[in-house]
Amino acid sequence: MKTAENIAFGKRVAELRRNAGYSQEQFAFKCDVDRTYIGTIERGEKSPTLNTIEKIALALEMSKKELFDY
């Protein structure tokens, strides 16, 4: 479900992923999730689980706090 929070978080993930030089496919592999799941997060269509948030932060080599710093 698209919410303002999901959309903002998705934009943040997409921006950080691109800045790190990853395609969605590369990033999904690094996060150990499906590429389509990354796409739904970036479009604000899904709320990632805490486990996925942890994987995203680790893949981007940042803390969860930094991930939400937007």
Task: List each language-model region with its residue ranges.
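Short basic helix-loop element that most often maps to the first helix and adjoining turn
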Residues: K11-F27, L60
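Helix-turn-helix DNA-binding elements, focusing on the entry/boundary residues of the two helices
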Residues: V13, Q24, R35, L50-I53
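Short alpha-helical DNA-recognition segment
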Residues: G21-T40
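Short amphipathic recognition helices of helix-turn-helix/homeodomain-type DNA-binding modules
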Residues: F68-Y70
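A detector for short, charged/polar N-terminal pre-domain segments
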Residues: M1-A8
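DNA major-groove recognition helix of helix-turn-helix/homeodomain DNA-binding modules
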Residues: N51-E66
